[in-house]
Amino acid sequence: RLEVFRTHGKIYEASASQMFGVPIDLIKKGNPEYALRQKGKVAELALGYQGSTGALINMGALDMGIPEEDLPDIVSRWREANKRIRDLWYAMDNAAVQVITQGGSIGINGLIITREFDYNQGTDCMTITLPSGRKLYYVSPGIGENQWGNPSISYMGMDQKTKRWKRIETYGGKLVENCVQAIARDC
């Protein structure tokens, strides 16, 4: 990804090239392969933080003429072409589950995930320490079970729609998104 931005900057074409095994030089206007650029674009925008077919639909994949039956393949191809990103989601998810259930700290790629208790204040948080030293706080973290029967991370926070304090579910991709945005802000 960094090399794409260092050179030509054609991230959608590069994504399509990786996903479909087509030389990037063929993904240009006038060529039949140019139709793959749209799939690369929607995949980049929808899938980077662990989105799936629903995220593709929300990003307008169907409105762009991508058939619904093609969406699972796009998700699979994007994840296969971006293994390091995919692996980071799962590493963050697994680390958060471990820290919430067992305590301690786990470092992942310059981030430190910790369970912190302040008995004087009565607070219990999972924190993620960023490279800058700033921390992201997840209040009253817990583990439940998601719709697939896997551990589900949750914390208390403000519901963005109702503006009420409630338990919010999260997952590895969302934790990665929070960190990426916070790191960008720190720069």
Predicted regions, residues:
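Conserved catalytic core of nucleotide polymerization and phosphodiester-bond processing enzymes
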Residues: 1-187
